Regions:
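Beta-rich carbohydrate-recognition and catalytic domains
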Residues: 1-169, 174-218, 230-279, 303-353, ...
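Juxtamembrane/interface motifs at transmembrane-helix termini
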Residues: 229-230, 479
Length: 491
């Protein structure tokens, strides 16, 4: 690789990334080698390892012209950093950079990356606007070359009336016959998002096939980060609407939603049957899935949202992380999520308390910590609310509060230590079970991931609470009977 822009990024990250100790990072969540991370990209299994690229600015802990960071793992928990994969260094992407995309394997064994290439273009009125096109890069899992044919998709490939300013985030895969398919999002003529399908025989020469789904100003405005995949006999179109209005389980702003339905491969027709929110917490966006060698559909996401990216720990050396990857399944027409089973393999010391009666705030021996896998089951009781406090000390805590009368679960990090005027509290409905509730909670220093009732609902949030705040307590307004099981993690 001879390009100076890429070599500069690689030299910088090698020097400064190595200066960040493991103790300064989460234990099992991917963070940038150095600097800034947002959307996970190119999540794939290639040459015996999981690859996770990511939107990346190595030079600062804030967004800037986008590179692609790169890490690999054999177990989705321990990540090895590889050198920066892409930099904004070609005529197609030398403006704001190499935006989000994906990866697949070619017939000759090379890896094909497809990404949104962005350049600034002067408009007839003199205004400079970013033009979004799709480009490719081909490599061996370490080094990637951008062919001279870039970009491979432009506005001319879109239906009439679709915007060249909002055309991005290709998710690529191979069909059974070897055809390359990719779904992108674009802004339709009505000013709201659409998901468009493109195909290619060789990965270089692409053509428009159809519009799979339209927003019609019903689910936010512009869409981002689409994915399209089969799951348990259904077809799923997953994406991130921007500027959502609150309705039902959806909240204001950025969401991740899944359209679940059927797909006719002969006519390329997707028929929607159900729509659901993928996470009811505070920090969850930019999902992407891959198919594991054993057939599992595994999802990653950015453990962040755009509205709170300015709330950073003072002096931080990195910013942004991805979730613990999740396995997806469909039950009763809805997607269930569970932490990847690889997490079970690192379970260490087990602490177990059974049939504990909880009234006033109570701590249980051995149940504490900031890196743990905790399952709490509220079995029964007469109570008006049940409260679980995490990452707690005299001044800090993040709470989960369950109201059995409304079946509402609330995640609240108002006292986690942030001084920012941002969203700190969200609620979601869980299935009513006469007061019973099961919560699996993943703690990893700066984050909390909650799986309610075996992943029927999830809630995710970052917390920048001092690591010394490691208390966990239980309380009920009334009387609740609980079981708690915690595993330390050997990482």
């Amino acid at each position: 690789m001879n390009d100076l822009t890429l070599q500069k990024a690689r030299a910088y990250e090698a020097e400064h990334g190595a200066a960040i100790s493991p103790a300064e990072r989460p234990a099992y969540h991917l963070t940038p080698y150095v600097g800034w991370l947002n959307d996970p990209n190119g999540f794939s299994y290639y040459k015996g390892k999981y690859h996770q690229f990511y939107q990346y600015n190595p030079y600062d802990v804030r967004w800037a012209p986008m590179h692609w960071g790169h890490a690999v793992s054999t177990d989705l928990l321990h990540w090895e950093y590889l050198p920066c994969a892409l930099a904004p260094d070609s005529p197609a992407d030398n403006g704001p950079g190499c935006f989000s995309g994906s990866a697949t394997e070619m017939d000759d064994g090379r890896q094909l990356l497809m990404y949104t290439s962005v350049i600034a273009e002067k408009q007839p009125n003199g205004e400079m606007r970013d033009i979004q096109t799709q480009s490719i890069a081909i490599g061996d899992g370490l080094d990637y070359e951008k062919p001279a044919c870039n970009p491979v998709l432009t506005q001319k490939d879109l239906p009439e009336g679709f915007s060249k300013f909002d055309f991005r985030d290709p998710k690529i895969w191979r069909e059974a016959d070897g055809t390359y398919s990719a779904v992108t999002v674009c802004l339709a003529e009505d000013g709201s998002g659409a998901a468009a399908l493109f195909q290619s025989k060789d990965g270089f020469d692409w053509h428009f096939v159809t519009v799979l789904e339209r927003c019609n100003n019903q689910y936010g405005k512009m869409w981002e980060c689409p994915d399209f995949f089969p799951l348990d006999g259904k077809q799923v179109l997953m994406l991130g609407p921007m500027e959502m209005l609150p309705k039902g389980e959806f909240h204001n702003g950025h969401n991740v939603i899944a359209f679940i339905g059927s797909y006719d491969e002969a006519t390329h027709t997707f028929t929607r049957e159900n729509v659901q929110l993928m996470d009811g917490g505070i920090d969850f966006y930019a999902t992407q899935t891959t198919l594991a060698p054993d057939g599992r559909r595994i999802m990653t996401a950015w453990l962040q949202t755009w509205s709170d990216t300015e709330d950073k720990p003072q002096g931080c050396k990195w910013f942004g992380q991805t979730i613990c990857p999740r396995e997806l399944h469909i039950k009763d027409g809805r997607i269930l999520q569970a932490p990847v089973r690889e997490l079970d393999a690192v379970h260490g010391k087990r602490t177990f308390h059974e049939n504990v009666t909880v009234q006033s705030e109570t701590a249980l021996e051995g149940i504490k910590g900031r890196v743990a896998d905790l399952t709490v089951t509220v079995q029964s009781g007469e109570y008006r609310s049940f409260t679980l406090k995490l990452a707690a000390d005299a001044d800090h805590y993040t709470s989960l509060v369950y109201d059995p009368y409304t079946s509402e679960l609330t995640l609240d990090r108002s006292y986690a230590g942030s001084r920012a005027d941002i969203v700190h509290r969200r609620s979601c409905k869980v299935r009513s079970q006469n007061g019973a509730l099961k919560l699996r909670i993943l703690l990893d220093k700066n984050s909390i991931e909650v799986f309610a009732n075996d992943g029927e609902q999830t809630m995710t949030a970052w917390i920048y609470t001092p690591q010394s705040a490691d208390g966990i307590t239980f309380a009920a307004d009334g009387k609740a009977i609980i079981t708690a099981e915690q595993f330390e993690l050997n990482l």
